[in-house]
Amino acid sequence: MWLRQSSGGGVASVGHVGPLRQRPIDAATDCDPRACYDSFCKHWQQAFEIIQHSAPPSHDDVLGVVSHLDYMVTLLLVELHHCNKVSLPAAEASGPPAAPCLEFLLSENLLDKLYEWACTTGRYANAVRLEQLKLYELLVSHSRHQLLCHEPFLRPLLKILASSQGEIFPPDLEKRLVILLNQLCVVLMQNVHLLDLFFFSAQTQVQEQILNGNVAPPKSGTTTNFIIFSLLIPYVHREGSLGHQARDALLLCMALSQKNSNIGTYIAQYSSICPLLVTGLGGLYSRLPNSIEISSIDWHRITPDDVTEIPELTLFMNALEFCNAVVQVAHEMIKQQLLDFMYQGFIVPVLGPAILQTNIDSQISAMSYLDLILRSITEPGLLRAFVRFLLDTEKFDGERILDALVERLNSPDANLCMVTMALFDTLLGLHCEDLMLELLLKFMLPGKHVPISHRHKINKIDPYLNSSEFFLELSPDVMKRARDLARPKSVHEPVVSELTPLPSLPSPVMSKTIGANWNYYGVHTGDSLYANIQAYLFEAHWRIAQCQKDCLKWANSYRYQKWPRHGQGRVHAHALELARQFFSEFGGGPIAANETGEKQLDSLQSIGESSGYESFKWRPADEESEATDTTVATTASEADMDHNSSSLSSVLGASGKRESWRTSNSNRNELILTDLDFSEDLFAQGTVSLGPFLNAIWGKLQTFTSNSLYVNLHLTGLITRLAWYPLPLIHSLLLRSDIAITSDTPSFHQVLRILKQQIDAELPVTEDSLEIIDVARSSLIDREFRLANARKGNEGSPMHHSQQQQMVTNSGQQQGQLRSAYATLSAATPVQATPTSAYDPFKRSDNKRRSISKSITSMFSRKSASTSTAPPNGSSASSGLSQIYAFFTGAASNLVGNNASNDGRGISQAQTSAGTCETSLSTQPPAGASRTGANATSTAASGSNSSIAGSTLTLSAQSNTTTHSASTLHGLDGGPSTGGFNSEPASLDSVASMGIIASTSGTERSRDLALCAVLMDEWLKELAAIAQEQSVVLVTEQGSL
């Protein structure tokens, strides 16, 4: 090689250097350092001769200098790689320098001379600047921070950076500049002590250049400048890799402001970054589509696939996520300034008018964008700004955004209604105290929705278990019958007497396996998740724990608590006086009767169930021992509310007086008067309002059987979201069937009873009804697995499909022999579950589901049409059922599977349900959530049967495009919609349109009721599980007190 053979006196020709530049850097470490140094010096000598020409440089001159610089860069690269470590300048002159070329570069001020010459190149300045930036980029990347300490390197670097301000460069030059700035930010982040070099030295350098006439004074009128940050600002909204690198470097600068207050002060007071970010965000929002093209009947929110497919939305989300990151890492001054600009310059003037538009399409798009924003941002400061925006009463002529959103829950437009409920699902998922107070708690804190005689029950735990039984009993009769028929009837399975089935169901044949095959209420589940409440218990446990963790951070505690023993004050005295006057009018009959020493009932005349009140009782001793002392609704930090709200003084008492009441009859009259406040709500006649939000939800629930399937999915999910809150006040409305409610609308439990009666009346337990129920359930299961495997099917090859079908067929041959005719029909859907399937019943919104092992594939699969076991008599199934069977085993993919191949976006939009907000684009629930004793739960959930696999989980789970639906009932189809906003469910309509279920004698109304029955049945199981888990939470809380 020429480098090793050279004597050092000559300079190789250009043709000899080329091969060295092309050699891998690892092969160049055996070079001769002396030869490299001589060649480096010779190239500089030739370049310097061109630079010293007095005449303006010509094209050839510039090309010659650039060529020599290129070779010098290559030699520096070889030397730096050979040295591995730079130590300059040499502290001791005892030996040769470790990097002689670099030593020569610095000692001879080559960089400064090169910069001075570049200023005279005129129209060739950009080409020379590009080579300079390459040189600096190389040196910074290989020497890290060592060279920044040396003035021969730092001074020309600051000069070239200062001269780049305000300039417009070609793309290749911009790229090199941003890369260099990014590298400098990384070095400064690792060596904060060097930060002042670029802050103050840059200031001095700018002043010098102003004096020399090379640079114009800054427009801001100040020479204070953080040169790196200033150069990065113009690229903050750029697209592509250039914009990403610039934003990354700016974030490093923001993080540096936390370590250096001078940087924070400069960015907040002298830079324009905050106004630029906000105005850019508003401009990008204005470019978003004003009307979103809805391609599926169940579309309700923007998904990650939508973001990637819409360029304008991608740019907007990049800017929003950058603002979120700035608030997270920047100095407090910068953070506060950006939040103020965001609220005054984007949230109020841009989002406000967009949401308050009157056009329905515009409302849908604006609310979808707001929902996407709330799911994307994570910084509490930004979330507080958006909550303030929702509750602001001054910016929009006295109209609150939150009230406008609540009104849209009543919209007859199904798409607007679903988008609104999805938005409220996100809002409730924030677990924000202010929002919950405005939506629910401020209407419930007075306690007027609960009669006085029932308020002592609110903190009791036992009724929660009774509520679980209550919810299970509300299941429609046809669902109970279908569930009973679906149980395997095997004479080889002995009866287990320890588990008692529900009274409303026939005694099933018990299985030897306890745990995975049985739920907590004695309902046999076999290898299916159908009727397996354990899966709901697991989900409820995790959701409630997450909600409880967030609610513990609230400023107030919205629950019924013990009244303090002392200091009732004027409210106590006033209540006592009013009560005495009341009882004096009625005489002392019932009260005087207490002199006998026996516990008797105190009744109030003409106050009965019609007003929502029960007669006042002297509770037995055993009940008092279990109940909490007389309670009131209070907050932890609102003492004024305790004295100003008459409703909060409705029940007054103390634990010490409770004991006296129990032991001394002579004090009982006075103590009863002390505990009751009849000032306002004694004669309330059921006119208490629960607020517009709950009234809208109850109104939608009352039309449950008339709503579309997808509206009901979101509705049930929203109510489930409320039930997750560990607040007894909310439980008194949703989970406590033993507490009467006095409101101007039917209570939640009354509506559920009405719905059960309506379904039972219109869908009686007949053969036709059972067939329609089976079709509804099977179609929902079929579409869930179709959605879960849509992407996998698109990506798979014919070999993949062949192996998948073979696996399903083989696994189907291993089961199904012991199933009844109805069970076999229910299982007719060919579940496409493979070892790569993403179905995980325990995670509702995790956007990367785990695969299922081959060992449980058989639990999901069914026989194909050709291998299915026919009924013994060969004709027990009707011709209509045979057609249904053929439809779900063969024709289903042709009928509804075209959506996957035609529109990937539709598929991504389709994987949705109605209950959580953890489908943020970035945050996901932990995968390892578990509870004590949940081994059987996980076993039961993993071994799910396709006949009901998805219908027992995630009834109210919200999923995005990267998730696979975990619920049959909530895996909403995303195919093209042909029925408009109020079209009926696509799967059943498709079946009916082909005449496949004509023989079932089912009308369109009965099919709708069948869907409602299946959905309601599974939702009630979920509510039962939540009630049981909430009782566990209360026991834990009381045990820790």
Curated annotation (Swiss-Prot):
Record-listed Phosphoserine modification sites: S490, S797
Protein's UniProt name: FHIP family protein CG3558
Pfam family, one: DUF5917
InterPro entries in alphabetical order: FHIP (IPR019384), FHIP_C (IPR045669), FHIP_KELAA_motif (IPR045668)
Keywords: Phosphoprotein
Chain intervals with Low complexity compositional bias: 927-947
Biased composition (Polar residues): 628-637, 800-818, 903-925, 959-968
The family this protein is said to belong to: Belongs to the FHIP family.
Region (Disordered): 619-648, 792-818, 858-879, 903-947, 959-986
